[in-house]
Amino acid sequence: MLLHIPNVLSPEEVRYFRDRLEDAEWTDGRVTAGEQSAKAKLNLQIPQDSAECRELGEFVLRALGRNPTFNSAALPLRVYPPLFNRYDTGMHFDAHVDNAIRPIPGAGMRIRTDVSSTLFLTGPDEYDGGELVIQDTYGTQSVKLPAGDMVLYPSTSLHSVNRITRGSRWASFFWSQSMVRDDTKRRLLYEFDCSIIETRKALPDSHPAVLGLTSTYHNLLRQWAEL
């Protein structure tokens, strides 16, 4: 499932991120890539252990915590500490699949990457090229979103970032280990949850239809979740 989530960050929050990142040290982005992906990758990142990355990463995690769409769609068990990248003119990332398992630095644990996320920090008018191109079961999708918006997609997807021909594209990116590893089951649960929300707009929570749908949703989640 590929999902666009608008307004994860407000315009004021995006400006704060941009100001902090302007002052950050940027290094070669290949340091976080696997051996094969590193050969396809040409971009910049701020170091994962930098004060800016830690502060802004915590900010992103708080924004995710208050976003019901992200939590319904990703059903996150663990979220990898958000990273920040930058593509200047001429930079790109050729087609690749994200590493299946990633160690969390300093945490003594690893996560399975089920859901990939890109949170855009520059608007589409600030650069040419730079589309996130995702190949999924419904074909090839080209994504270029407003600043503050985010896209979710299965980490199993082959994806790339087109070469930048003007300007600079900034973003935060991270992975989630979902309580439900199978993308089809996650999509069904998300659609089920959306249907419950719409039903509750028309019927009281005590209505048998609402109670029945809610009960079935939670029983399916109980059946499929891995903790």
UniProtKB/Swiss-Prot annotation:
Binding of 2-oxoglutarate, residues: 169
Enzyme Commission numbers on file: 1.14.11.-
Required cofactor names: Fe(2+); L-ascorbate
PROSITE patterns: FE2OG_OXY
Cofactor binding notes: Binds 1 Fe(2+) ion per subunit.
Domain Fe2OG dioxygenase, first and last residues per copy: 78-178
Biological process, per Gene Ontology: DNA damage response; intracellular iron ion homeostasis
InterPro entries (UniProt xref): Oxoglu/Fe-dep_dioxygenase_dom (IPR005123), PKHD_C (IPR041097), PKHD_hydroxylase (IPR023550), Pro_4_hyd_alph (IPR006620), Pro_4_hyd_alph_FE2OG_OXY (IPR044862)
Keywords: Dioxygenase, Iron, Metal-binding, Oxidoreductase, Vitamin C
Single GO MF descriptor: iron ion binding
EC category: oxidoreductase
SUPFAM superfamilies named among the record's database cross-references: Clavaminate synthase-like
Binding site for Fe cation: 96, 98, 159
Domain of life of the source: Bacteria
Residues spanning the membrane: none
Protein name per UniProt: PKHD-type hydroxylase GOX0559
Organism encoding this protein: Gluconobacter oxydans (strain 621H)
Lineage, opening ranks: Bacteria, Pseudomonadati, Pseudomonadota, Alphaproteobacteria, Acetobacterales
